[in-house]
Amino acid sequence: MTASELVAGDLAGGRAPGALPLDTTWHRPGWTIGELEAAKAGRTISVVLPALNEEATIESVIDSISPLVDGLVDELIVLDSGSTDDTEIRAIASGARVVSREQALPEVPVRPGKGEALWRSLAATSGDIVVFIDSDLINPHPLFVPWLVGPLLTGEGIQLVKSFYRRPLQVSDVTSGVCATGGGRVTELVARPLLAALRPELGCVLQPLSGEYAASRELLTSLPFAPGYGVEIGLLIDTFDRLGLDAIAQVNLGVRAHRNRPLDELGAMSRQVIATLLSRCGIPDSGVGLTQFLPGGPDDSDYTRHTWPVSLVDRPPMKVMRPR
C-alpha cells in the first residue's frame, strides 16, 4: 500500500494520519523494579552509552544506571567514539566498562559518526534487549532505563521503544519551575515535518530522533544502521516498514536536558537526517554535503565557507557480520 492510499484510508476513517497517539504509549509508567526484574523471564538487558568527549556528563549518566547493574541490567558499557578528553578515565572510575570502536569490531575499519558507534555496540554486547542512552544528559532520571524496557518486558509484539519528553532549550529552565520548551530543534523543524510529508503514519511518534530508546536484539541485528545522526530516523522507519506501528511503543521520560548544540552543528545534523529519511522513502539524495557561510570579522564583512559531509552508506545488519 502506498503512502497516498494510507492517507486516504485514514481520512475516510475520520482522522488525520498520525493524529492519534499510539495505543502503545505510556504517559506515566508505573512498573516497579521488582516487577520488571520478574518480567525478564531469563532475558538479559544491555545498556550502551555512546560517547565522544563527554567528560562533563558521563559520570552522572553512569551513576543513574549503575544501581541497576546485576539486577534489572546485566551489562553496562560505554562505547567510546575516539574521545580526546577524560571521558574514558571518568567512565572507568564510575564503574563502567569502556569499549572503543576498534575493540568492538576489530576486523572492520572504523567510520565516523554516531550510527557507527551504535552499530558496533551490537558486537560488544550480548543482551537480548539493548538500551541506548545518550552520554550528554544532564542529571538524568534513574528510572530512564526501567521505563524504556518496561514495554518490551511486559507488552506483546513490541520490538522498539522510543522515549519522549519535554525539552527545555536552556539547562537553567529545568529547575526554574517554568514549563519551558524550545529544545529538539532538528526534531520539530526537520524530522517531524518530513515524516508528515513522507511517512504520515509515524506522526504519532513524539520524538523520532530521541537518543534514549530500547529494542530487541533480534530487531537491531536484522536492520541496517544509517550513518551519523541518521541512525535514529533510519531505525524508526525501518522498524515501521518491516513490522508496522504495533511493534513501536513510546514512553514519557518527563524532562530531558542536555548540551544543546549551535545552529551550524544542527544544520549538519539535519542534513544527515534528511539524507537518511529520503533514502528510506525511496527518494534519491544528491549526496552533496551542506555548505554554510559563517560570518566573521569586526563588522561581519568576512564570511568563511565550510562544507559538512553527508553519507549515504549504511552499515549492513549485524547478523551479516556476526551470525549467531
Swiss-Prot record:
Cofactor(s) demanded: Mg(2+); Ca(2+); Mn(2+); Fe(2+)
Keywords: Calcium, Cobalt, Glycosyltransferase, Iron, Magnesium, Manganese, Metal-binding, Transferase
Class in the EC hierarchy, top level: transferase
Annotated UDP-alpha-D-glucose binding sites: 50-54, 81, 114, 134-135, 229-232, 256-261
Record: residues binding (2R)-2-O-(alpha-D-glucopyranosyl)-3-phospho-glycerate: 114, 184-187, 256
Pfam families: Glycos_transf_2
EC numbers: 2.4.1.266
Cofactor binding notes: Requires divalent cations for activity. Mg(2+) gives the maximal activity, but the enzyme can also use Ca(2+), Mn(2+), Fe(2+) or Co(2+) ions, but not Zn(2+) or Cu(2+) ions.
Gene Ontology terms for molecular function: hexosyltransferase activity; magnesium ion binding; protein homodimerization activity
Keyword Glycosyltransferase: yes
Residues that hold (2R)-3-phosphoglycerate according to the record: 184-187, 260
Catalytic reactions of this protein: an NDP-alpha-D-glucose + (2R)-3-phosphoglycerate = (2R)-2-O-(alpha-D-glucopyranosyl)-3-phospho-glycerate + a ribonucleoside 5'-diphosphate + H(+); (2R)-3-phosphoglycerate + UDP-alpha-D-glucose = (2R)-2-O-(alpha-D-glucopyranosyl)-3-phospho-glycerate + UDP + H(+)
GO BP term (any one): UDP-alpha-D-glucose metabolic process
Additional information: Was identified as a high-confidence drug target.
Family: Belongs to the glycosyltransferase 2 family.
PANTHER family: GLUCOSYL-3-PHOSPHOGLYCERATE SYNTHASE, UNDECAPRENYL-PHOSPHATE 4-DEOXY-4-FORMAMIDO-L-ARABINOSE TRANSFERASE-RELATED
Protein function: Involved in the biosynthesis of 6-O-methylglucose lipopolysaccarides (MGLPs). Catalyzes the transfer of the glucose moiety from UDP-alpha-D-glucose (UDP-Glc) to the position 2 of 3-phospho-D-glycerate (3-PGA) to form glucosyl-3-phosphoglycerate (GPG).
Subunit record text: Homodimer.
Protein name: Glucosyl-3-phosphoglycerate synthase
Gene, per the UniProt record: gpgS
